[in-house]
């Protein structure tokens, strides 16, 4: 029996889906435990490319159980759409399990998300306008609607009427926009619930049963640790806990978690606003963006690009208890003459190794870089560290030294067979 968490160590988009799919080959269950359909991940299998936002990456392993845990906020419309899309490509989804305790995103959450973001003006945080934050707000306020409620026609109607009365008052009196209609939302979303009913169960029982039977469980974190609402660059963060939310979001106790696998790119990217100390604004950043196809899976927005930041990685290692590191996109850096690694920050004339909580301090931080020579050789077929060109190997090993984590895998391309194992996780 082994349980492992796969979590992004930067600002999301690190390639967690690929690693989860790769590691999921030896797992008996794969589970999402936080976030919502703002967390796009891309899986490439042969000639087919799949873009998923809610369904765990493990769905492509038909003999595995795929779980959407209670900590996820679920847009039923998005989930039904994903399921239909997979069915169209003959992907078996019978092993999907949806927590009856997961909270539901409804149209008023999405509308409120957009209105709240627009009202912030220059202080906007870069939300994906998917209703994630407002859904978590309702959850904390104890007025949310859960999947179990969605399946109960009378209870769903009662709760929806109560919530719409409150939200429509906000829309008409505060934001001065049109109210939402109860009947259309109720009919549409109740039908979604009926379509999802076959997947709904107590997923905590499912996951703990797998562990009790000596099976392997892989937990898939969404976004990244620097987007964690507590440990990230607040308020430019998501509304959940990628770093430590696995137990509360899955119903599997902390004592049953064995490994925490951090995923990072060989550089850094970020979507949306917020601090980014190593951000590049020159042709080097453009080169990496183009070479790495750095555009958001969900939004299509160009990602911001920067050098690898070991201050960020050490922060992530500490707050999430990382035990191993998976390094992706090493091949993207091919062709750059010089590579830089941020090893510390300078703040008001002082060298610091911590990641500041204060946005004003972060704005005054200047990265301290270590420079390494780049490489021109094609590395997309490399299978071992020893096969890498000298400069590429030196770069990978230097990152590992600075972060002080064992390197479990390194990837030299998007395909499953381009992810190379250095240390077994299972």
Curated annotation (Swiss-Prot):
GO terms for cellular component: cytoplasm. Substrate binds at residues 297-303. Its cofactor is Mg(2+). Binds 1 Mg(2+) ion per subunit. GTP binds at residues 12-18, 40-42, 303, 329-331, 411-413. It is an enzyme of class 6 (ligase). The active site is at residues 13, 41. Disulfide bonds: none annotated. It catalyses: IMP + L-aspartate + GTP = N(6)-(1,2-dicarboxyethyl)-AMP + GDP + phosphate + 2 H(+). Mg(2+) binds at residues 13, 40. IMP binds at residues 13-16, 38-41, 128, 142, 223, 238, 301. InterPro entries: Adenylosuccin_syn_GTP-bd, Adenylosuccin_syn_Lys_AS, Adenylosuccinate_synth_dom1, Adenylosuccinate_synth_dom2, Adenylosuccinate_synth_dom3, Adenylosuccinate_synthetase, P-loop_NTPase. SUPFAM superfamilies: P-loop containing nucleoside triphosphate hydrolases (SSF52540). Gene3D superfamilies: Adenylosuccinate Synthetase, subunit A, domain 1 (3.40.440.10), Adenylosuccinate Synthetase, subunit A, domain 2 (1.10.300.10), Adenylosuccinate Synthetase, subunit A, domain 3 (3.90.170.10). Pathway: Purine metabolism; AMP biosynthesis via de novo pathway; AMP from IMP: step 1/2. Its EC number is 6.3.4.4. One of its GO terms (molecular function) is GTP binding. It comes from the Bacteria. Plays an important role in the de novo pathway of purine nucleotide biosynthesis. Catalyzes the first committed step in the biosynthesis of AMP from IMP. Belongs to the adenylosuccinate synthetase family. HAMAP family: Adenylosucc_synth. Homodimer. This is Adenylosuccinate synthetase. It comes from Latilactobacillus sakei subsp. sakei (strain 23K) (Lactobacillus sakei subsp. sakei).
């Amino acid at each position: 029996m082994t349980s492992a968490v796969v979590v992004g160590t930067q600002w999301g988009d690190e390639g967690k889906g690929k690693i989860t799919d790769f590691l999921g080959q030896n797992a008996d269950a794969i589970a999402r435990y936080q976030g919502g359909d703002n967390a796009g991940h891309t899986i490439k299998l042969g000639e087919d490319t799949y873009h998923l936002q809610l369904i765990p990456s493990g769905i492509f392993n038909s003999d595995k159980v795929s779980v959407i845990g209670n900590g996820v906020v679920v847009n039923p419309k998005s989930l039904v759409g994903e399921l239909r899309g997979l069915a169209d490509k003959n992907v078996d989804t019978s092993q999907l399990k949806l927590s009856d305790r997961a909270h539901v995103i409804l149209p008023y959450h999405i509308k409120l998300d957009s209105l709240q973001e627009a009202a912030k003006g220059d202080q906007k945080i870069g939300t994906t306008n998917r209703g994630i934050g407002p859904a978590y707000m309702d959850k904390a306020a104890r007025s949310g609607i859960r999947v179990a409620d969605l399946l109960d026609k009378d209870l769903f109607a009662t709760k929806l009427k109560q919530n719409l009365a409150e939200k429509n008052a906000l829309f008409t009196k505060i934001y001065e926009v049109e109210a939402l209609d109860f009947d259309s939302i109720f009919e549409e979303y109740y039908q979604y619930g009926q379509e999802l009913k076959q997947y709904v169960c107590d997923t905590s029982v499912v996951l703990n049963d797998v562990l009790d039977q000596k099976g392997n469980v892989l937990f898939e974190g969404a976004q990244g640790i620097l987007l964690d609402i507590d440990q990230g660059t607040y308020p430019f963060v998501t509304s959940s806990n990628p770093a430590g939310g696995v137990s509360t979001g899955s119903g599997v106790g902390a004592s049953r978690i064995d490994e925490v696998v951090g995923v990072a790119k060989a550089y850094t990217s970020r979507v949306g606003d917020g601090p980014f100390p190593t951000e590049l604004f020159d042709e080097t950043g453009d080169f990496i963006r183009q070479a790495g196809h750095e555009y958001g899976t969900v939004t299509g927005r160009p990602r911001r690009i920067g050098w690898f930041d070991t201050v960020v990685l050490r922060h992530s290692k500490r707050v999430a208890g990382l035990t191993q590191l998976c390094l992706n996109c090493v091949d993207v850096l091919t062709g750059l003459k010089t590579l830089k690694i941020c090893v510390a920050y300078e703040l008001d004339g002082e060298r610091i190794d911590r990641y500041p909580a204060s946005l004003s301090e972060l704005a005054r931080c200047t990265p301290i870089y270590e420079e390494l020579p780049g490489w021109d050789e094609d590395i997309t077929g490399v299978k071992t560290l020893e096969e890498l060109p000298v400069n590429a190997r030196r770069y990978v090993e230097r990152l590992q030294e600075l972060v002080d984590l064992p390197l479990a895998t390194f990837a030299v391309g998007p395909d499953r067979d381009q992810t190379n194992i250095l240390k077994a996780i299972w």
